[in-house]
Amino acid sequence: MIFGHISQPNPCRLPRAIEKALDFLRTTDFSMLKPGVVEIEGRNIFAQVLDLTTREQHENRPEVHRRYLDIQFLAWGEEKIGIAIDTGNNKISESLLEQRDIIFYHDSEHESFIEMIPGSYAIFFPQDVHRPACIKNKEAAIRKIVVKVAISELD
């Protein structure tokens, strides 16, 4: 997992596909977009623009992906995201791996939380369990952009 703020340069060299996704986040005015999918580089790099309401932690299931990494970016609002390493010990609640590249767990072993503010992003790789859209202080409307980057595009 990588955690940062879009206004701060990343001191590390990242794969081209991740840099392209971060450039999209840096240069797009998300107040001008409607919720939905935006293709950045076909199905290899695309963004989901989501308007959500944060919920209690127990109402959101932890998740992982295998074919895509997630770059979760908060355009406005506030949220907490649960994070953990996928130890292989989490009980599967629902597997939609073939249809949507997502596995939901009942719970997440050794979970910690990060706090997201507008401009924050978190990059989740296949080994990173994450539980997005959790209440930080109180229920809040958020706009979140999830950029999906195909693992096959990482160089």
Task: Please annotate each region the language model reported.
Residues 1-49, 61-64:
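A short, N-terminal "cap"/entry segment at the start of jelly-roll beta-barrel domains
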Residues 50-67, 98-110, 131:
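Short acidic (Asp/Glu) patches
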Residues 114-133:
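Conserved metal-binding segment of the jelly-roll/cupin
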Residues 121-123, 139-155:
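A short hydrophobic beta-strand segment most commonly corresponding to one strand
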Residues 42, 58-70, 89-93, 109, ...:
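A short beta-loop-beta micro-motif enriched in histidine and acidic residues
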Residues 67-69, 73-81, 88, 97-102:
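Glycine- and acidic-residue-biased ligand/ion/polar-headgroup-sensing regions
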Residues 134-138:
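Short proline/glycine-enriched turn/loop segments at secondary-structure junctions
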Residues 40-48, 80-96:
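Short beta-strand/loop turn elements enriched in aromatics
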